[in-house]
Protein backbone atom coordinates (compact mmCIF):
# COMPACT_ATOMS: atom_id res chain seq x y z
CA UNK A 1 0.00 0.00 0.00
CA UNK A 2 1.07 3.59 -0.59
CA UNK A 3 2.42 5.29 2.53
CA UNK A 4 -0.66 7.37 3.29
CA UNK A 5 -3.21 7.13 6.07
CA UNK A 6 -6.36 6.10 4.21
CA UNK A 7 -4.49 3.66 1.98
CA UNK A 8 -2.82 1.81 4.84
CA UNK A 9 -5.88 1.73 7.08
CA UNK A 10 -8.14 0.45 4.31
CA UNK A 11 -5.61 -2.20 3.31
CA UNK A 12 -5.47 -3.37 6.94
CA UNK A 13 -9.26 -3.29 7.18
CA UNK A 14 -9.97 -5.19 3.96
CA UNK A 15 -6.87 -7.28 3.28
CA UNK A 16 -7.11 -6.00 -0.30
CA UNK A 17 -4.76 -3.87 -2.38
CA UNK A 18 -5.63 -0.23 -3.16
CA UNK A 19 -6.55 -1.14 -6.73
CA UNK A 20 -9.25 -3.40 -5.29
CA UNK A 21 -10.49 -1.48 -2.24
CA UNK A 22 -10.47 1.87 -4.03
CA UNK A 23 -8.64 4.05 -1.49
CA UNK A 24 -5.59 4.85 -3.61
CA UNK A 25 -4.52 8.03 -1.80
CA UNK A 26 -5.53 10.63 0.75
CA UNK A 27 -6.62 12.71 -2.24
CA UNK A 28 -7.05 11.82 -5.89
CA UNK A 29 -8.19 13.31 -9.18
CA UNK A 30 -11.86 12.93 -10.09
CA UNK A 31 -12.33 12.75 -13.84
CA UNK A 32 -15.98 13.79 -13.62
CA UNK A 33 -15.31 17.06 -11.79
CA UNK A 34 -11.75 17.67 -12.92
CA UNK A 35 -10.76 18.34 -9.30
CA UNK A 36 -8.86 16.68 -6.49
CA UNK A 37 -11.13 15.19 -3.83
CA UNK A 38 -10.75 14.00 -0.24
CA UNK A 39 -10.93 10.23 0.20
CA UNK A 40 -13.92 9.75 2.56
CA UNK A 41 -15.77 12.98 1.87
CA UNK A 42 -19.49 12.42 1.34
CA UNK A 43 -21.79 15.44 1.19
CA UNK A 44 -24.95 13.44 1.92
CA UNK A 45 -24.32 12.50 5.59
CA UNK A 46 -23.25 15.77 7.28
CA UNK A 47 -21.13 16.00 10.39
CA UNK A 48 -23.02 15.22 13.58
CA UNK A 49 -21.65 17.79 16.00
CA UNK A 50 -22.92 18.78 19.43
CA UNK A 51 -21.01 22.07 19.26
CA UNK A 52 -20.68 23.50 15.79
CA UNK A 53 -18.60 26.43 14.65
CA UNK A 54 -15.25 26.30 12.94
CA UNK A 55 -12.11 27.96 14.20
CA UNK A 56 -10.59 29.83 11.27
CA UNK A 57 -7.20 28.32 10.45
CA UNK A 58 -7.69 25.27 12.67
CA UNK A 59 -7.23 22.77 9.84
CA UNK A 60 -3.58 22.16 8.90
CA UNK A 61 -4.02 18.72 7.25
CA UNK A 62 -3.45 19.33 3.51
CA UNK A 63 -5.66 16.38 2.56
CA UNK A 64 -8.56 17.60 4.72
CA UNK A 65 -8.29 21.05 3.17
CA UNK A 66 -9.50 19.49 -0.09
CA UNK A 67 -12.90 18.82 1.50
CA UNK A 68 -15.79 20.97 0.37
CA UNK A 69 -18.22 19.51 2.92
CA UNK A 70 -18.05 18.10 6.45
CA UNK A 71 -19.78 14.82 5.53
CA UNK A 72 -17.86 11.57 5.94
CA UNK A 73 -18.69 7.95 5.09
CA UNK A 74 -17.11 4.67 3.91
CA UNK A 75 -19.15 4.60 0.67
CA UNK A 76 -16.01 4.98 -1.44
CA UNK A 77 -14.47 1.79 -0.02
CA UNK A 78 -15.12 -0.88 -2.64
CA UNK A 79 -14.18 -4.04 -0.69
CA UNK A 80 -15.75 -5.50 2.47
CA UNK A 81 -13.83 -4.87 5.68
CA UNK A 82 -13.13 -7.33 8.47
CA UNK A 83 -15.72 -5.54 10.58
CA UNK A 84 -18.34 -5.91 7.83
CA UNK A 85 -17.66 -9.63 7.58
CA UNK A 86 -17.75 -10.07 11.36
CA UNK A 87 -21.13 -8.37 11.50
CA UNK A 88 -22.48 -10.78 8.88
CA UNK A 89 -20.94 -13.82 10.59
CA UNK A 90 -22.66 -13.01 13.90
CA UNK A 91 -26.02 -12.22 12.37
CA UNK A 92 -25.64 -8.52 13.13
CA UNK A 93 -25.02 -9.10 16.85
CA UNK A 94 -21.40 -7.89 17.05
CA UNK A 95 -20.79 -4.39 18.38
CA UNK A 96 -18.31 -2.66 16.10
CA UNK A 97 -16.53 0.64 16.76
CA UNK A 98 -13.51 2.49 15.41
CA UNK A 99 -12.05 5.63 16.97
CA UNK A 100 -9.10 7.80 15.99
CA UNK A 101 -7.59 11.23 16.03
CA UNK A 102 -8.27 11.28 12.26
CA UNK A 103 -11.59 10.84 10.50
CA UNK A 104 -10.19 8.71 7.66
CA UNK A 105 -8.54 6.28 10.08
CA UNK A 106 -11.77 5.66 11.98
CA UNK A 107 -13.99 5.45 8.90
CA UNK A 108 -11.79 2.88 7.16
CA UNK A 109 -11.60 0.58 10.18
CA UNK A 110 -15.32 0.84 11.02
CA UNK A 111 -16.36 -0.11 7.50
CA UNK A 112 -20.03 0.03 6.59
CA UNK A 113 -21.25 -1.93 9.59
CA UNK A 114 -19.59 -0.15 12.50
CA UNK A 115 -19.66 3.27 14.10
CA UNK A 116 -16.73 5.62 13.57
CA UNK A 117 -15.74 8.53 15.83
CA UNK A 118 -12.83 10.93 15.53
CA UNK A 119 -11.36 14.02 17.18
CA UNK A 120 -12.36 17.53 16.17
CA UNK A 121 -9.62 20.13 15.70
CA UNK A 122 -12.31 22.82 16.13
CA UNK A 123 -13.56 22.03 19.64
CA UNK A 124 -11.87 18.89 20.97
CA UNK A 125 -15.03 16.76 20.79
CA UNK A 126 -15.17 13.20 19.55
CA UNK A 127 -17.54 13.42 16.61
CA UNK A 128 -19.11 11.36 13.84
CA UNK A 129 -21.37 11.82 10.82
CA UNK A 130 -25.04 11.07 10.24
CA UNK A 131 -24.01 8.10 8.12
CA UNK A 132 -23.52 6.28 11.43
CA UNK A 133 -25.89 7.95 13.90
CA UNK A 134 -28.77 10.42 13.96
CA UNK A 135 -27.79 11.60 17.44
CA UNK A 136 -24.92 11.04 19.84
CA UNK A 137 -25.48 8.44 22.57
CA UNK A 138 -25.77 9.96 26.03
CA UNK A 139 -22.35 8.67 27.03
CA UNK A 140 -20.71 10.47 24.08
CA UNK A 141 -22.50 13.71 24.93
CA UNK A 142 -21.44 13.32 28.56
CA UNK A 143 -17.81 12.70 27.58
CA UNK A 144 -17.77 15.73 25.28
CA UNK A 145 -19.38 17.88 27.97
CA UNK A 146 -16.40 17.23 30.23
CA UNK A 147 -14.26 19.22 27.76
CA UNK A 148 -11.11 17.39 28.72
CA UNK A 149 -8.98 18.89 25.97
CA UNK A 150 -9.80 22.39 27.22
CA UNK A 151 -8.35 21.45 30.59
CA UNK A 152 -4.93 21.55 28.90
CA UNK A 153 -5.34 25.32 28.49
CA UNK A 154 -1.98 26.97 29.14
CA UNK A 155 -0.16 23.65 29.59
CA UNK A 156 2.64 22.20 27.47
CA UNK A 157 4.11 19.01 26.07
CA UNK A 158 7.04 18.13 28.32
CA UNK A 159 9.71 15.48 27.78
CA UNK A 160 8.95 12.22 29.57
CA UNK A 161 12.63 11.61 30.43
CA UNK A 162 15.60 13.86 31.21
CA UNK A 163 17.13 15.22 27.95
CA UNK A 164 20.28 13.11 28.35
CA UNK A 165 18.25 9.88 28.17
CA UNK A 166 17.34 10.36 24.50
CA UNK A 167 19.41 8.97 21.64
CA UNK A 168 22.68 10.82 21.02
CA UNK A 169 22.73 13.03 17.95
CA UNK A 170 19.07 14.00 18.10
CA UNK A 171 19.17 17.79 18.28
CA UNK A 172 16.00 19.29 19.66
CA UNK A 173 15.61 22.10 17.15
CA UNK A 174 16.22 21.77 13.45
CA UNK A 175 15.37 24.46 10.88
CA UNK A 176 13.18 22.12 8.81
CA UNK A 177 10.86 21.28 11.72
CA UNK A 178 7.42 22.88 11.59
CA UNK A 179 6.42 25.45 14.19
CA UNK A 180 2.62 25.48 14.49
CA UNK A 181 2.50 29.25 15.01
CA UNK A 182 3.91 29.23 18.52
CA UNK A 183 4.08 25.49 19.29
CA UNK A 184 7.82 25.77 18.78
CA UNK A 185 10.54 23.48 17.43
CA UNK A 186 12.00 22.54 20.81
CA UNK A 187 10.76 21.36 24.19
CA UNK A 188 8.65 22.29 26.00
CA UNK A 189 5.90 22.79 23.39
CA UNK A 190 3.16 25.14 24.68
CA UNK A 191 -0.45 24.36 23.76
CA UNK A 192 -1.38 27.98 24.38
CA UNK A 193 -4.84 29.22 25.33
CA UNK A 194 -7.85 27.04 24.52
CA UNK A 195 -9.33 29.75 22.29
CA UNK A 196 -6.30 29.75 19.97
CA UNK A 197 -7.23 28.47 16.46
CA UNK A 198 -4.51 25.80 16.65
CA UNK A 199 -5.00 24.78 20.29
CA UNK A 200 -6.73 21.46 19.57
CA UNK A 201 -4.39 20.70 16.67
CA UNK A 202 -1.41 21.20 18.98
CA UNK A 203 -2.96 18.88 21.57
CA UNK A 204 -3.48 16.19 18.92
CA UNK A 205 0.14 16.62 17.74
CA UNK A 206 1.34 15.44 21.15
CA UNK A 207 1.02 12.48 23.54
CA UNK A 208 -1.95 14.25 25.14
CA UNK A 209 -3.97 13.60 21.99
CA UNK A 210 -3.42 9.86 22.35
CA UNK A 211 -4.32 9.98 26.04
CA UNK A 212 -7.58 11.79 25.28
CA UNK A 213 -8.45 9.15 22.69
CA UNK A 214 -7.65 6.39 25.18
CA UNK A 215 -9.97 7.96 27.74
CA UNK A 216 -12.75 8.09 25.14
CA UNK A 217 -12.04 4.45 24.29
CA UNK A 218 -12.34 3.42 27.94
CA UNK A 219 -15.71 5.13 28.20
CA UNK A 220 -16.82 3.41 24.99
CA UNK A 221 -15.86 -0.04 26.29
CA UNK A 222 -17.78 0.52 29.52
CA UNK A 223 -20.83 2.26 28.06
CA UNK A 224 -21.31 -0.16 25.18
CA UNK A 225 -20.36 -3.17 27.35
CA UNK A 226 -17.91 -4.58 24.84
CA UNK A 227 -16.77 -8.13 25.45
CA UNK A 228 -19.43 -8.88 28.04
CA UNK A 229 -21.15 -11.80 26.29
CA UNK A 230 -20.37 -14.72 24.00
CA UNK A 231 -20.66 -12.59 20.83
CA UNK A 232 -17.38 -11.27 19.43
CA UNK A 233 -17.14 -7.46 19.49
CA UNK A 234 -14.61 -5.31 17.63
CA UNK A 235 -12.87 -2.07 18.57
CA UNK A 236 -10.22 -0.32 16.50
CA UNK A 237 -8.23 2.46 18.16
CA UNK A 238 -5.95 4.37 15.81
CA UNK A 239 -3.59 6.59 17.79
CA UNK A 240 -2.61 9.48 15.52
CA UNK A 241 0.03 11.48 17.41
CA UNK A 242 3.06 9.53 16.10
CA UNK A 243 1.98 10.18 12.51
CA UNK A 244 1.45 13.91 13.11
CA UNK A 245 4.71 14.32 15.01
CA UNK A 246 6.65 12.60 12.21
CA UNK A 247 5.11 14.90 9.60
CA UNK A 248 5.90 18.07 11.55
CA UNK A 249 9.22 17.17 13.20
CA UNK A 250 10.56 14.13 11.31
CA UNK A 251 11.42 10.54 12.33
CA UNK A 252 14.86 11.50 13.69
CA UNK A 253 13.46 14.16 16.03
CA UNK A 254 13.46 14.15 19.81
CA UNK A 255 9.71 14.73 19.52
CA UNK A 256 9.27 11.43 17.69
CA UNK A 257 11.30 9.49 20.23
CA UNK A 258 9.33 11.04 23.08
CA UNK A 259 5.89 10.49 21.54
CA UNK A 260 6.73 6.80 20.98
CA UNK A 261 7.91 6.42 24.58
CA UNK A 262 4.71 8.02 25.83
CA UNK A 263 2.55 5.95 23.47
CA UNK A 264 4.11 2.84 25.01
CA UNK A 265 2.71 3.93 28.39
CA UNK A 266 -0.66 4.73 26.84
CA UNK A 267 -0.81 1.23 25.32
CA UNK A 268 0.11 -0.30 28.69
CA UNK A 269 -2.77 1.63 30.26
CA UNK A 270 -5.12 0.34 27.55
CA UNK A 271 -4.07 -3.28 28.01
CA UNK A 272 -4.46 -3.06 31.80
CA UNK A 273 -7.94 -1.62 31.36
CA UNK A 274 -8.97 -4.36 28.90
CA UNK A 275 -7.59 -7.02 31.21
CA UNK A 276 -9.66 -5.62 34.07
CA UNK A 277 -12.90 -5.18 32.11
CA UNK A 278 -12.80 -8.05 29.62
CA UNK A 279 -9.72 -10.16 30.33
CA UNK A 280 -6.74 -10.35 28.01
CA UNK A 281 -7.30 -14.10 27.79
CA UNK A 282 -10.67 -13.28 26.18
CA UNK A 283 -9.25 -10.68 23.80
CA UNK A 284 -7.35 -10.81 20.51
CA UNK A 285 -5.00 -7.81 20.34
CA UNK A 286 -3.54 -6.81 16.96
CA UNK A 287 -0.92 -4.06 16.67
CA UNK A 288 0.06 -2.45 13.37
CA UNK A 289 1.25 0.79 11.84
CA UNK A 290 -0.76 2.03 8.88
CA UNK A 291 2.28 3.21 6.91
CA UNK A 292 5.94 4.10 7.15
CA UNK A 293 7.68 7.47 7.12
CA UNK A 294 10.72 8.63 5.16
CA UNK A 295 13.27 10.91 6.75
CA UNK A 296 13.00 14.64 6.20
CA UNK A 297 14.97 15.40 2.99
CA UNK A 298 17.04 18.02 4.85
CA UNK A 299 18.08 15.39 7.42
CA UNK A 300 18.64 12.52 4.99
For each feature predicted by the language model, list its residue ranges.
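Stable alpha-helical elements in mature extracytoplasmic
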Residues: 8-12, 78-82, 92, 213, ...
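Short secondary-structure boundary/capping segments
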Residues: 111-122, 249-257, 292-300
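Short, solvent-exposed loop/turn segments at the edges of secondary structure
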Residues: 4-7, 230, 280
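Generic beta-sheet signal
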Residues: 232-237, 283-285
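Metal-dependent active-site segment of extracytoplasmic phospho-/sulfohydrolases and closely related
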Residues: 262-300
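His/Asp/Glu-rich, glycine-adjacent segments
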Residues: 16-17, 23-231, 240-247
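Short, solvent-exposed turn/loop segments enriched in Gly/Ser/Thr/Pro and often Arg
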Residues: 1-11, 98-107, 238-240, 289-292
